[in-house]
Swiss-Prot record:
Reaction equation(s) it catalyzes: shikimate + ATP = 3-phosphoshikimate + ADP + H(+)
Biological pathway: Metabolic intermediate biosynthesis; chorismate biosynthesis; chorismate from D-erythrose 4-phosphate and phosphoenolpyruvate: step 5/7
Cofactor binding annotation: Binds 1 Mg(2+) ion per subunit.
Binding locations of ATP: 14-19, 120, 156
Listed name of the protein: Shikimate kinase
Main localization category: cytoplasm
Subunit annotation: Monomer.
Biological process terms in GO annotation: amino acid biosynthetic process; aromatic amino acid family biosynthetic process; chorismate biosynthetic process
Length: 171
């Protein structure tokens, strides 16, 4: 891998973007970044607080800036927020500046992986499954639109998925 290429992980909440991203970056000797963690570092507050104070629109503005900044780097693995693909600008940034990998998972797996996570503002409702289904309807076609590679994450360890990504990318 002479040229340091960026790898951008997209997919729904609970697909494993952050965990798989860390493994992938380590295996490829690349820098790992997580857009949500970067937002928290820049604001000095957690995502739930940003949502409470600025609303989803404020959060999405911050997310767009973070992804624009990070995607300028070379040789990174970036785990993006699940909703980032709803922005055409972000989709364009990701497509133009690296390889986009869509980590696909089922609603059942999303529910299982996110049910105890209180840091996901969109899921703090009576019926998180309904929210996840609604988001999937909107976002899944967008993930597919920009994906260079699609990898299913259900019932596989993060390390196995990272290896599959490396294999599919020919690294």
């Amino acid at each position: 891998m002479a040229e340091k290429r960026n790898i951008f992980l997209v997919g729904p909440m609970g697909a494993g973007k952050s965990t798989i991203g860390r493994h992938l970056a380590q295996m490829l000797h690349l820098e790992f970044h997580d857009s949500d963690q970067e937002i928290e570092q820049r604001t000095g507050a957690d995502i739930a607080w940003v949502f409470d104070v600025e609303g989803e629109e404020g959060f999405r503005r911050r997310e767009a800036q973070v992804i624009a900044d990070l995607s300028e780097k070379q040789g990174i693995v970036l785990a993006t927020g699940g909703g980032s693909v709803q922005s055409k600008d972000i989709r364009n940034h990701l497509s133009a500046r690296g390889i986009v990998v869509y980590l696909e998972t089922t609603i059942d797996k999303q529910v299982a992986r996110t049910q105890r996570d209180k840091r996901r503002p969109l899921l703090q409702v009576d019926d998180p499954r309904e929210v996840l289904e609604s988001l999937a309807e909107i976002r899944n076609p967008l993930y597919e639109e920009i994906a260079d590679v699609v990898v299913k994450t259900d019932d596989q360890s993060a390390k196995v998925v990272a290896n599959q990504i490396i294999e599919k990318l020919g690294f």
